[in-house]
Amino acid sequence: MLQRTLAKSISVTGVGLHSGERVALTLHPAPENSGISFRRTDLDGEMGEQIKLTPYLINDTRLSSTIVTDKGVRVGTIEHIMSALSAYGIDNALIELNAPEIPIMDGSSLPFIYLLQDAGVVDQKAQKRFLKILKPVEIKEAGKWVRFTPYDGFKVTLTIEFDHPVFNRSSPTFEIDFAGKSYIDEIARARTFGFMHEVEMMRAHNLGLGGNLNNAIVIDDTDVLNPEGLRYPDEFVRHKILDAIGDLYIVGHPIIGAFEGYKSGHAINNALLRAVLADETAYDRVEFADSDDLPDAFHELNIRTCG
């Protein structure tokens, strides 16, 4: 299977969830073996240089997965666009933006899916590399845990836990095996969520300034405040899976393995990636010259190119 990039550049505007700033974002094709990179067009000189994404650049995970370089350049809330790039198997792309944060759009990855559909996807000449998990790797901290285990495909199982009436009405656990289920159908529409009291607290600290009922599920003491309700009965845990897929794709390759988590979040997801990369016996980078040898979870990627 070959690496892929966008067929053309494409742009969108939106608002940063935490900054409230208007953001212009453009996705560009990129050369093979270049990976996913970001560039802040509002910064000059070294501060405006291209940033090659790696797990070691995620240095702020308080409210999202945020790049913070050694020069102090920030690119925040990258997990939703990374999740969409993962769904399309995009290996190489340059993402330019004129603000410190990726726009939140509607709080899901669906607008970025539409953006990628409009741009189109093309195969390149180099072979796509996959990160294959060879042995279990687990991180536990403060009552939370995440782990990778070997698996011939890509499967995600997450459980959330909130002591709140809204969450008691839906299953706290969701599992998706991408050999038989579609990311676009099952995950892409799930929106970020937050509690009304947290929104008020964040705004007091100049955070969450761009959040509203059009780009997040907002919950009060008893109910969802969004008049349209939920997009899935278990939208909350599905969004956590959306986030996790984006966080994991920061490693730069599709993952062949199973990911499980209990009360997972950006910090612990990133810690798991770093733990895997720190143990050379835990993974291998593999290629599939013959697409028939691909695990079933990745066969759908073959139909998402425009030649």
Swiss-Prot record:
Pfam families: LpxC (PF03331). Its cofactor is Zn(2+). InterPro entries: Ribosomal_Su5_D2-typ_SF, UDP-acyl_GlcNac_deAcase, UDP-acyl_GlcNac_deAcase_C, UDP-acyl_N-AcGlcN_deAcase_N. It is an enzyme of class 3 (hydrolase). The active site is at H266. It catalyses: a UDP-3-O-[(3R)-3-hydroxyacyl]-N-acetyl-alpha-D-glucosamine + H2O = a UDP-3-O-[(3R)-3-hydroxyacyl]-alpha-D-glucosamine + acetate. Keywords: Hydrolase, Lipid A biosynthesis, Lipid biosynthesis, Lipid metabolism, Metal-binding, Zinc. Pathway: Glycolipid biosynthesis; lipid IV(A) biosynthesis; lipid IV(A) from (3R)-3-hydroxytetradecanoyl-[acyl-carrier-protein] and UDP-N-acetyl-alpha-D-glucosamine: step 2/6. One of its GO terms (cellular component) is membrane. GO terms for biological process: lipid A biosynthetic process. Zn(2+) binds at H80, H239, D243. Its EC number is 3.5.1.108. Signal peptide: none annotated. One of its GO terms (molecular function) is UDP-3-O-acyl-N-acetylglucosamine deacetylase activity. NCBIfam families: lpxC (TIGR00325). Belongs to the LpxC family. HAMAP family: LpxC (MF_00388). Catalyzes the hydrolysis of UDP-3-O-myristoyl-N-acetylglucosamine to form UDP-3-O-myristoylglucosamine and acetate, the committed step in lipid A biosynthesis. This is UDP-3-O-acyl-N-acetylglucosamine deacetylase. It comes from Neisseria meningitidis serogroup A / serotype 4A (strain DSM 15465 / Z2491).
